[in-house]
Regions:
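Glycine-rich beta-strand-to-loop/alpha-helix junction loops that act as flexible
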Residues: 1-6, 46-48
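Charged (often Lys/Glu-rich) extended helix/loop segments that serve as interaction or gating elements
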Residues: 37-187
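Short intrinsically disordered, low-complexity coil segments enriched in acidic
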Residues: 1-4, 35, 160
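Alpha-helix-loop-beta-strand connector modules within alpha/beta enzyme cores
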Residues: 21-33
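Glycine-rich tight-turn/loop motif centered on a GG-T
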Residues: 10-19
Length: 187
């Protein structure tokens, strides 16, 4: 069976009750095996269900820019790190962890890539200031695997939190990483 298990992105999203689903499928599968006269193996490809909610993208605010219609919050990341909002119009909840008690305001959170690089349009966030850290939720699925070095940008580090302790599991890329696969051509 393949993916499709629901993950909660919006507050009122329907999620998959994995225990209930497992019980129902398990019962029917055992009945099928019995009627088929053979023991079979049932395998699931869980997709984003296992990892989406366990990953967060932390970004730092570089600039706040007010226009006549919009307040933009520019951050030090972009679609090269989390392309889902741009590619699929996917919603990722955003939280300002640097100012949890701040007054709610409306921001459009944008990245540093030159195209229309937007993480979230017209989002209610606690007041955002330059230097504040924002958290993009549900970034565990496909974040790294869909990331790129577009515009010669480095991929970020990945940190695992286990039993309250942080452990670096993937270092941030650097210029050597960008150049590592290039071969000097003799012309």
């Amino acid at each position: 069976f393949g993916s499709g298990f629901k993950v909660k992105y919006h507050e009122n999203d329907i999620t998959t009750n994995i225990e209930d689903l497992g019980a129902k499928i398990g019962d029917r599968f055992r009945e099928f095996c019995k009627s088929y006269g053979r023991e079979l193996t049932l395998v699931f490809e869980p997709g984003k269900f296992l990892v989406s909610e366990s990953g967060y993208l932390l970004v730092r605010t570089n600039v706040i820019k007010q226009t006549t219609a919009t307040v933009f919050c520019g951050v030090d990341s972009g679609q090269n790190h989390l392309i889902r909002p741009m590619m699929y119009d996917a919603y990722h909840h955003i939280t300002n962890v640097s100012n949890p008690g701040g007054i709610e305001r409306i921001y459009t959170v944008v990245g540093y890539i030159c195209e229309t690089d937007t993480f979230g349009w017209d989002r209610k966030l606690n007041e955002v200031r330059e230097g504040d850290v924002l958290v993009l939720h549900n970034a565990g699925a496909y974040g790294y695997s869909m990331s790129s070095n577009y515009n010669s940008r480095y991929r970020p580090a990945e940190v695992l939190i286990h039993n309250g302790k942080a452990k670096l599991i993937r270092r941030r890329e650097n210029l050597d990483d960008l150049l590592a696969t290039q071969i000097e051509a003799e012309l």
